[in-house]
Amino acid sequence: MADLSSRVNELHDLLNQYSYEYYVEDNPSVPDSEYDKLLHELIKIEEEHPEYKTVDSPTVRVGGEAQASFNKVNHDTPMLSLGNAFNEDDLRKFDQRIREQIGNVEYMCELKIDGLAVSLKYVDGYFVQGLTRGDGTTGEDITENLKTIHAIPLKMKEPLNVEVRGEAYMPRRSFLRLNEEKEKNDEQLFANPRNAAAGSLRQLDSKLTAKRKLSVFIYSVNDFTDFNARSQSEALDELDKLGFTTNKNRARVNNIDGVLEYIEKWTSQRESLPYDIDGIVIKVNDLDQQDEMGFTQKSPRWAIAYKFPAEEVVTKLLDIELSIGRTGVVTPTAILEPVKVAGTTVSRASLHNEDLIHDRDIRIGDSVVVKKAGDIIPEVVRSIPERRPEDAVTYHMPTHCPSCGHELVRIEGEVALRCINPKCQAQLVEGLIHFVSRQAMNIDGLGTKIIQQLYQSELIKDVADIFYLTEEDLLPLDRMGQKKVDNLLAAIQQAKDNSLENLLFGLGIRHLGVKASQVLAEKYETIDRLLTVTEAELVEIHDIGDKVAQSVVTYLENEDIRALIQKLKDKHVNMIYKGIKTSDIEGHPEFSGKTIVLTGKLHQMTRNEASKWLASQGAKVTSSVTKNTDVVIAGEDAGSKLTKAQSLGIEIWTEQQFVDKQNELNS
């Protein structure tokens, strides 16, 4: 047994060393096959001799049993956000405030990693708990998923009790590999590495997270009691010695001009990095000076985050293609010479509509400027006429639908051209794709390519046909093995139990969005009651305007639609509202019965999370500001809704005020 114990220790040392070389230093000294061989040897020993399995065993990285959900846990110390700077003037004002309070200052500049903030707790040197940032006060316990990240030490080099903060991210190489795999499986692609990292860390099955090859950079420690550090730079050096991975592209600078030089350097070099960054974090380096400056309610006074402007690149417009949406809108898309934008290769970008093409004088063959709106959606910003070739072609939208040949129309008051043929194949396929989407019937496994195959094979012609599919229908399709077929049929069966609002939204009734579907489902409770409503009744409902009322009644009066609903009923698709009625919610008086509008970008939660929480407290969340609005919650870059609220004298809360009120209720 002594020999076995020695071998286990040897395997631990070797696997930890090889893992660090591969995942942290990106410089492996042995081939993957050698690592896998040693790992399987250790797994076998632990299976046969469980007494040798330790909490810091390299086998933990493989992942464990799937969880039912993530527990909410309060942070020992709140995870605050940072104030933002968008230009040199913002930074100089920050510097002036600092120097007015503490005099001469040295700054620490660090890359702002574009990922997911996490908090890691260690007891006696062992990693015991990892949380997401959440709302800053409460996060989700994702410990098992974080254990699969090789850059996170399961055991520190010293037996300290400490909590560190960092940013979990997905390297670009892992992101490209993941999206290639998802594309092969006809699954929805991730928009960017940040979304991929967040989605990977919220997998209930940690084995799936382990396959995603995430990494992490640690950037701070909560309590410096056990640290021999007098500055942020020394604290990062100490973290390195303890076995943590910090970002080495940091720099100490003596003044704000040094900060600006650092920003200029990494603005030009950010694409050379193997991971995404979205800005620069600037901190007062001296820890005593940090203590002297303290905190506001939402952020430290001694730090700020400079956010990069949206990156713009020049490429060539090769062609313009058209797509037809489920409501018949014809949208032009730019086909581009592939170019890197904000870390990903872009070959297509939105042109929105014909008016935009003409207003911006965009022609096929032009050199055009492309950016990602919010670093996510590529769009053509403008053409460069001075570079225009002689053979550049002015684009004219067609007069007839490229899918069905029906004449296109422009409805009064709209900029888009529209195909109004109800039997247009492109619209029908897009309608099927919409029906199975996440906010509608949420049928996992029915991707675009499979739906197109099913439609072209005439196995489905309308949404009800989905519930009539059999194993014999699905098995002959491309890339559909037995396991995939079984999973898809199970997902279709599960979708039958969705609440009425999912079905209403999935039917694709024009002008009827997620919120209005929820309102109608809650109000009428069954599809049969909805089939009898009139426009006059609907317009009396708050949040249901004239357009929605007319569209819903016209749609539900159609005999073909009534036959479709009966076809769904025949397959026992649920047509009843299953949610909790707002009138039954005993919310807090601060929110109950109030009409609230969310505007601008929220940092401590998503808009959807905020809306759900407000609804749980009996509030009514609407999309427009009127004299009946009680409160407007204004996030970053709030625009016309905030201006209108100010002109109407409506109460306005910042995001932090909203979060503070949530925390008061939870305490």
Swiss-Prot record:
Record flagged with keyword Magnesium: yes
EC number: 6.5.1.2
Gene3D superfamilies: 5' to 3' exonuclease, C-terminal subdomain, 6.20.10.30, BRCT domain, DNA ligase/mRNA capping enzyme, Helix hairpin bin, Nucleic acid-binding proteins
Keyword Nucleus (UniProt): no
Active site, per annotation: K112 (n6-amp-lysine intermediate)
Domain of life from the UniProt record: Bacteria
BRCT domain: residues covered: 586-667
Keywords: DNA damage, DNA repair, DNA replication, Ligase, Magnesium, Manganese, Metal-binding, NAD, Zinc
A GO-annotated cellular component: cytosol
Annotated catalysed reactions: NAD(+) + (deoxyribonucleotide)n-3'-hydroxyl + 5'-phospho-(deoxyribonucleotide)m = (deoxyribonucleotide)n+m + AMP + beta-nicotinamide D-nucleotide
Residues reported to bind NAD(+): D32, S33, E34, Y35, D36, S81, L82, E110, R133, E167, K283, K307
Pfam families to which the protein is assigned, alphabetical: BRCT (PF00533), DNA_ligase_aden (PF01653), DNA_ligase_OB (PF03120), DNA_ligase_ZBD (PF03119), HHH_2 (PF12826)
GO molecular function annotation: DNA binding; DNA ligase (NAD+) activity; metal ion binding
Residues that coordinate or bind Zn(2+): C401, C404, C419, C424
Annotated PANTHER family: CHROMOSOME TRANSMISSION FIDELITY FACTOR 18 (PTHR23389), DNA LIGASE (PTHR23389:SF9)
Homology family: Belongs to the NAD-dependent DNA ligase family. LigA subfamily.
Protein name (record): DNA ligase
Native organism: Staphylococcus aureus
